[in-house]
Amino acid sequence: MEFDHEIHPTAIIHPNAKLAENIKIGAYSIIGKFVELGEGTEIGNHVSITGHTKIGKSNKIFHSSSIGEQPQDMKYKDQETCLEIGDRNTIREFCTINTGTVEGNKKTLIGNDNWIMAYVHIAHDCIVKNNIVIANNATLAGHVEIDNYVVLGGFTAIHQFCKIGEHAITMGGTLLSQDVLPYVRAVSRGGMAFPNGINSEGLRRRGFTSEAIN
């Protein structure tokens, strides 16, 4: 079946890659053999998408991002692992998102409606759910789990295996080596993260009443 695509002539698309309808791919981007792109997804210039990577509908991936490369894990021995990205995500410039490992169900997962800003790194086996904002230069180590409606401030760094509860927020430059409870605002002091009250402003923006917040 022939689909109507906008693919720059300098882009390199492996013949086995699976492209749905209305795909846009910019100059010098590379789409690998085992990649699947959902309907309406737009790929910018100089983007590399490789590995066993499945990307859903209406995503926008900006230039120079690297999606689906092998995990940065010294235990990794070229096993077949994957990355799955849902629908309507925005992935800005120079982001890196790796596939999973056999120690982590072989899969890295990104949900729907997430806003991932420039220079973000999402490591192997992470689970990033839905409606999440990850600001510039944030780093998620392996096996990190981010629940729905979380906001991660710029330069937030999260240690492996940490979990961030829904509706939580981290201030810019927060260094996390432990889990963060839902609804909490986390800040760094002296190189360590501490809870600093409730994410009241974020909860109000999402329709929580004052009674519910209090």
Predicted regions and their residues:
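Glycine-rich hexapeptide-repeat left-handed beta-helix
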Residues: 1-6, 12, 18, 42-130, ...
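A glycine-/small-residue-rich N-terminal strand-loop-strand element
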Residues: 22
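Basic, Lys/Arg-rich alpha-helical nucleic-acid-recognition elements, primarily the DNA-binding modules
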Residues: 26
